[in-house]
Amino acid sequence: VLVEEYLTSVISSEMSATSSLALLKAHAIISRSWLLNKLYNKKLSLQQSEFRTFTEDGTEKFTRWQDHLDHIDFDVCADDHCQRYQGITKVSSPAVAEAIKETYGKVLFFDGKICDARFYKACGGVTEYFENCWEEVHHPYLVPVKDNLDDQAIPNLTDEKECEKWLLSAPKSFCNTTDKAVLSEVLNNYD
């Protein structure tokens, strides 16, 4: 499947194909960046033989992150582990086709490299460092940020009491909405 055809399905599978054009275009660029970063890093890691065994106290074990190395016979999977892909026959929309066309070839770069543009569908009001969720690699562009525009500082979520207070609250955030119009614009009817 060609990259742009793949992205048409990904965007229509991960979010509503009737979302605003601006949102669809942003999703196209993010998803294309993630995909091309994965393909490049998979090729690089296979060339560098990253399949290693490690010995710890005389016990042999195989250590790796669940990532692009999980897929030997194909590039990416069709579920949320990679990007939700429901096939090229997935119902799309003219707006998705327009978003793909208008962003053709556009990707996110940082320091001369295509960004690992992973994102999440669930939100607790603040993001986390990449290395705390995925693999022990620091990306300066994937650090904690609040999911709102107020001026309050991010609480120290490494402090148990602060974290408990945060988790038991309903933090003000863009994703903490019950507005049915907003939800229907961004979510498919099965999310």
Please provide the spans of the model-predicted regions.
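Conserved, single-site charged/polar hotspot
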Residues: 1-191
